[in-house]
Amino acid sequence: MGKSAKILVVDDDPDMREALQMILESAGYTVVMAEDGKQCLSKLKEEQPDLLILDLLMPRMDGFEVCKALKDPRYAKYARMPIIILSSVQEGVSHRRYELETGVRLDVDDYVEKPIESSVLLERVGKIIKRIAKE
């Protein structure tokens, strides 16, 4: 799989989507984009990505709802989809805060803080891609 892995980036901010696309494509990844959770669920079926990079706070359907939807039997095929959450909250606080606020355990692989540092993002994406390549 390696660098040819396909990554679905979901963020309502077009500038953030473009920045993430540039960072990921410069490292050799294939990038598909969606602007909200509803579009994300459609793209999952169409594109069959290897990894989902998901903003939590979006209009129409947010990241919380996407994580919850992936537990639904209709999306059982994607239940083990690796997810990196984009968060503007400090990483050490994010997981506890979001679990408390939503009452739903977010089963995600990692968190990346906004503003995004490309080296941090690429390191975390690389770790997940290597892990899933071994599965």
Predicted segment positions?
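Non-catalytic signal-transmission and effector/linker regions of two-component phosphorelay proteins
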Residues: M1-K6, S119-E135
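Active-site beta3 strand of CheY-like receiver
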Residues: E47-I53
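Charged docking surfaces used in two-component/phosphorelay signaling
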Residues: E18-S26
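Acidic catalytic/metal-coordinating carboxylates
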Residues: D36-Q39, D62-L70
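Short hydrophobic/Thr-rich beta-strand motif most characteristic of the beta2 strand and flanking loop
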Residues: G28-E35, K43, V112
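Active-site residues of response regulator receiver
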Residues: D55, S87
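Receiver (REC) domain active-site loop signature in two-component systems and cognate sites
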Residues: M58
